[in-house]
């Protein structure tokens, strides 16, 4: 699998595997910024595999729509993550645990980047295996005091 990063739309016409004369599946990552990008890439045969990230897709609802489109069009997907808090890591872990990912995600322990993360229990890997809690919501408790301490801007709806 070859992962292409930040391949702008104006270059997408160069992505067709037939033109490259390679058999390696093309995985798009940062190039897919939402459902419309994914739909375009599928329609024009520019994608073999998708690396999906909730934040890049625009939230959980568009991510769900993208996963459903991948399933309908038989495009394998896998779940990636970035430097992010345990809340986002747990969301990505829950998505990766759906069971039909193409391959293991590039997830890491939730306490990897922050000395005091926002969730309990931490998302951890033991011997390469991720334990995903099955409680309500994401299955973890959010430390409200830590969230408040890290908050830069707050909006009340």
Predicted regions and their residues:
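Flexible C-terminal active-site loop/helix
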Residues: 83-157
């Amino acid at each position: 699998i070859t992962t292409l990063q930040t391949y702008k739309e104006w270059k997408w016409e160069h992505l067709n595997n037939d033109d490259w004369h390679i058999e390696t599946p093309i995985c798009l990552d940062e190039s897919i910024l939402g459902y419309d990008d994914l739909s375009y890439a599928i329609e024009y045969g520019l994608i073999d595999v998708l690396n999906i990230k909730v934040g890049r897709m625009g939230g959980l609802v568009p991510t769900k729509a993208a996963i459903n489109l991948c399933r309908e069009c038989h495009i394998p997907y896998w779940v990636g993550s970035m430097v992010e808090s345990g809340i986002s890591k747990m969301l990505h872990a829950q998505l990766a645990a759906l069971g039909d990912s193409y391959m293991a995600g590039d997830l890491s322990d939730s306490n990897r980047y922050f000395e005091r993360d926002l969730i309990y229990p931490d998302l951890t890997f033991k011997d390469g295996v991720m334990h995903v809690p099955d409680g309500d919501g994401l299955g973890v408790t959010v430390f409200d005091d830590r969230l408040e301490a890290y908050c830069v801007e707050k909006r009340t709806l």
